Amino acid sequence: MEKLRMNVQGRVQGVGFRYMTKMVADQLGVTGSVRNEDDGSVSITAIAPEDIMETFIKKIKDSPSPAGRVTYVDIQEDPLLEETEQFKVIQ
C-alpha cells in the first residue's frame, strides 16, 4: 500500500474540486481525505495499492473538476498515515 500526502495548487477551491476528488477516490477504492487550505491550495491524504495510486495521481493532476485547473502537485510519502475505511471531505 502506498500512503501519500499531496498538496495541490492552482484553481482548486470554489470549483467542486474536493467533491470531485472524493468521487474519483470512491470509484478507484482510494481511502483518505481532502480539505481546503488557507493559502488556496487543497491537501489530500491517500492510501491505495501502487497501481491504483498512479491512476489517482494522474486524475488529480488532470483536475477531477471540469472548472478546476491544477498547476502543481507536491507529493510526499507518509508511512505513518493511518488507514481509514473511506475517503472523506473535510470541511
Curated annotation (Swiss-Prot):
It catalyses: an acyl phosphate + H2O = a carboxylate + phosphate + H(+). Transmembrane segments: none annotated. GO terms for molecular function: acylphosphatase activity. The keyword Hydrolase applies. The active site is at R18, N36. Belongs to the acylphosphatase family. This is Acylphosphatase. The gene is acyP.
